[in-house]
Structures are given as C-alpha cells and as structure tokens.
Amino acid sequence: LCFINNQLKQQISAVMQRSTLKVITYNIHKGFDSSNRQFILHGIKDSIRQIDADVVFLQEIHGERNISNNRFDDWPSNNQFEFLADEVWHHHAYGKNAIYKSGHHGNAILSKYPFVEWENIDVSLMQSHSRSLLHGTIEITETRQHVHIICVHLGLFGMERQRQLAKLASRIDSHVPHDAPLIVAGDFNDWLGRAERYFAKDLNVHEVFKLSHGRHARTFPAWRPLLSMDRIYSRGLELVDCQCLHGNPWRKLSDHIPLMAEFAIK
C-alpha cells in the first residue's frame, strides 16, 4: 500500500510539474561576451540548463562559422543550437537570417516538446540587414494542445522595425487561430516601446512584463541594463511568473540578459 501511495504521489507530482510551460528568450551574441573577446558559449549552456525551461528562444546564434573553428579550442564540433540543445531539448528549429562567407547566424528555438511544423519567414528590408521570424507550432505531449511560438529579432532602424512589426502582426493574424495559445519572444530592439500598437488592440497579444509590472523589463546592456530590448508576448495563456534574470552569471555572458516567463497550460 505504501508503494502504491508513493507511486500515486510521484504521478501527481509529475502532472503538477507538467501543468506549466516555462520559456526563456536570450540574445546570445553569437556565443561571445560583450567585448567580443571571450567565447562564453559553454557558460551560456550551463546557465540556461539551470533555468530548466521547456522552450528556449535564441537570437544571434551561429548555424555555421568556419573561421572561429580555428581560433578557439573550445569551439563546439557541431553547430551552436545543437550544442546548446544537447540532451535536454530534443527538438529544435533554426532559421538563418544573416549569411556571409564564413557562415551564417540567425534565430533558434529549443523545445522539450515536438514540433508539429515550423517555418522561417524573411522580413528583411535590405540585403545588408537580414532579419527573419522563426514561427513554429509545438504539441504539449500530455494534453495534445498546440502552442504557436515565434522567435523574433527585429532591425535597428525605426522604419525597418515598423515594417517588420507590421509583417509579424500580419503573420499572427493569418496563421495563428484566434483561440490558439501563442508566445512571441525575442530581441525587438524596441527601446521606444512602439510594438504595442501592433499587438494589443487588434490581436489581443500582450507583453508579460508590462502586464504584470507596468513596464517592460530592461535587458541591455547586460552589465547595466537600461534599455528594454527583449520581450515576451503572449495570448491565450495564463501568466504564472515572469523574471528578468539580472546579476551573475548573466551580466558576464552575452551583452543582453535573458527573460523568463511561466504559463499555465491546463
């Protein structure tokens, strides 16, 4: 009887643990510190593992880089998103948006849940400033629920961002059912806070930190965050918790600090 009770306790505990969906978004600066001198991808790997997120949204991640293979002894033998995913996140998608002679970088999503489908959407306005949206749908294994996830890295220039935001809003409107759970996360470069006009009123998509704290989280630069560059938006999910991961080790890794949010999925 004690054995059965312990089994039941374990099952209940497992169900309770699966009742939330934890996500983080992180611009990893191609695996280098803010000075571009130290290769810190191994530190990033160890740190994001400690968060134990179900889904990881990554920006500025190398899909291929040939020159660096010869410069750093600890450069991974596989690509960066596979190196970070390792044995924790068995499902991943990568969309390249900046291509050069020595390789390419872009956005990636690491997930503990399988992808139903994913697509990389080019939103570049100029060849020299390539940008894309990585849109995937994952299935929560225990409930068969589908969740749309979009990883974003928008441009540095105001007019460029406005057009990209319009394309993102159009993508949500045309490809995400209104009753489907949705998470949009990434580096919006939106320090002026103009993304809201594209999401809140017409799409009912809200930024979790502004919703819970009254303002966007400050994520850049990592050593003294002043600008609100990174965001997590959601629709159709109940927010349980959200945190801006200040302090060590994050301030010594990338030039951005990550954001974490947890949602109820029941």
What is the predicted role of each segment?
Residues 95-100, 124-125, 245-249:
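Short, solvent-exposed loop/turn elements at beta->coil junctions and helix N-caps
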Residues 3, 8, 13, 137, ...:
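Metal-dependent phosphoester-hydrolase catalytic domains
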Residues 101-102, 126-130, 158-160, 250-253:
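Solvent-exposed loop/turn segments connecting transmembrane beta-strands
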Residues 16-23, 105-107, 111-116, 129-151, ...:
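Beta-strand-turn-beta hairpins that frame and shape the catalytic cleft
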Residues 23-28, 47-72, 110, 136, ...:
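Active-site beta-strand/loop signature of hydrolases that rely on acidic residues for catalysis
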Residues 30-33, 63-66, 100-103, 157-160, ...:
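Active-site environment of divalent metal-dependent phosphoester hydrolases
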Residues 2-87, 94, 99-104, 166-167, ...:
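N-terminal, active-site-proximal structural segment of metallo-dependent hydrolase catalytic domains
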Residues 86-88, 102-117, 224-240, 264:
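Conserved beta strand-loop-helix elements of the APE1-like EEP
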